[in-house]
């Protein structure tokens, strides 16, 4: 558009030199006319360079508009940890808690009893340095040392566990490449209970009396309790969804059909080893990958969608299913699995009639006969951010994480 506008503006200007040249030619000599033409040619050459610059300037915003422009998105990351109360102190930690409840002013012994915890995790796939958090846990207060500052948290004691929760806000630069990588990214939270991993500032930190007072932005017991109960409710909903999937998969294989499959002779299994081996390789690889995960299900939270069993599907098919915009690939995978199961059942029935059957006593005593297949749940919920899972965690939704610290014997 800028190029056409420039040509339209310069059309009258290109006519003006011609009229001036003719009038000047009548009154001057030929040499003066040649000098005048050379001067005009130089002026036109200098003007011809300007449209290129205008074209370049006009093309720059178009290229930036079509390119992958990053967007800064604030992300709130909330962590809730449950620490055991009676761990390694022979009941001293619990007795100090009861002592502080009765006499809050006597805090000299309470400040000396502290435990050290160091946490590291990679928030984004391309992070080179992990996010680090240091925790000093006292009987009635916890100090959380973040990169942005120090937070005071009042733990919520539930039985023999002390819950500590805090929030961190990260400004993430979101691009198309990051959205592609983050769908397959899993956050692994690593935790150490050693003093060597702590920074020098935290290692020699001494809790003062002011540490028990209410700080600005501190997490109180009621807030920690509300946050933990909310996370627990979300995790129970996720467990119920997986149980529904398992019940539906069991209904697809009723007990009557299972008994019929158990009565198949052992010779049938030997003659058909080549057929199920190829189809079961993908399911075995997928089950191994699920066992390596920390939780039994992988969930993407934000929109609640019905969960679907994908046992027997390869990892490439699952990735294609996640990246696809429609559900056509999902229906194709399910139809393919059903057709394979029906074809194998019909072939098995035909070959059973041709072969001799085993005695019932041998079939009941033989534990290697083919039984019902194990149905593994793979629940998918469309969202931008995946579930943030740790080493010891309960499945939950949103950007929340529940981690249980195991007790030592």
UniProtKB/Swiss-Prot annotation:
Domain of life: Eukaryota
Region Disordered: start-end pairs: 36-67, 239-298, 338-373
Positions with biased composition (Polar residues): 268-281
Stretches with biased composition (Basic and acidic residues): 36-50, 245-265, 282-294, 338-350
Compositionally skewed regions (Low complexity) per UniProt: 51-67
Name of this chain's protein: Uncharacterized protein CFAP92
Source organism of this protein record: Homo sapiens (Human)
């Amino acid at each position: 558009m800028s190029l056409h506008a420039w040509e339209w503006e310069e059309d009258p200007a290109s006519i003006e030199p011609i009229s001036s040249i003719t009038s000047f030619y009548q009154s001057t000599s030929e040499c003066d006319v040649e000098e005048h033409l050379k001067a005009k040619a130089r002026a036109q050459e200098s003007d011809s360079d300007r449209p290129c610059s205008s074209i370049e300037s006009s093309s720059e915003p178009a290229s930036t508009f079509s390119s992958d422009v990053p967007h800064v998105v604030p992300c709130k990351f909330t962590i809730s940890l449950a620490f055991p109360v009676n761990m390694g102190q022979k009941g001293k930690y619990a007795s100090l808690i009861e002592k502080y409840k009765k006499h809050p002013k006597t805090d000299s012994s309470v400040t000396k009893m502290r435990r050290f915890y160091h946490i590291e995790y990679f928030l984004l796939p391309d992070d080179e340095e992990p996010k680090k958090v240091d925790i000093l846990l006292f009987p009635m207060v916890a100090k959380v040392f973040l990169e942005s500052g120090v937070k005071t948290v009042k733990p919520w004691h539930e039985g023999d566990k002390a819950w500590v929760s805090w929030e961190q806000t990260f400004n993430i630069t979101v691009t198309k490449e990051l959205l592609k990588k983050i769908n397959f990214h899993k956050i692994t939270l690593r935790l150490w209970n050693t003093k060597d991993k702590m920074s020098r500032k935290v290692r020699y930190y001494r809790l003062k009396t002011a540490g028990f007072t209410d700080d600005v932005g501190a997490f109180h017991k009621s807030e920690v309790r509300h946050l933990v109960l909310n996370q627990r409710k979300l995790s129970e909903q996720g467990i119920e969804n997986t149980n529904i999937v398992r019940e539906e998969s069991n209904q697809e294989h009723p007990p009557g059909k299972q008994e019929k499959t158990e009565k198949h002779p052992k010779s049938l299994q030997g003659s058909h080893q080549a057929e199920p081996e190829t189809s079961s390789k993908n399911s075995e690889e997928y089950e191994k990958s699920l066992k390596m995960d920390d939780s039994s299900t992988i969930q993407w939270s934000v929109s609640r969608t019905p969960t679907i069993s994908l046992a027997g599907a390869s990892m490439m098919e699952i990735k294609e299913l996640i990246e696809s915009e429609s559900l056509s690939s999902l229906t194709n995978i399910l139809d393919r699995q059903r057709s394979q199961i029906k074809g194998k059942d019909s072939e098995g029935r035909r070959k059973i009639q041709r072969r001799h059957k085993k005695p019932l006593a041998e079939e009941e005593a033989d534990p290697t006969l083919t039984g019902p297949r194990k149905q593994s749940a793979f629940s998918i919920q469309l969202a931008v951010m995946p579930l943030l899972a740790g080493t010891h965690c309960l499945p939950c939704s949103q950007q929340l994480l529940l981690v249980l610290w195991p007790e030592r014997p």
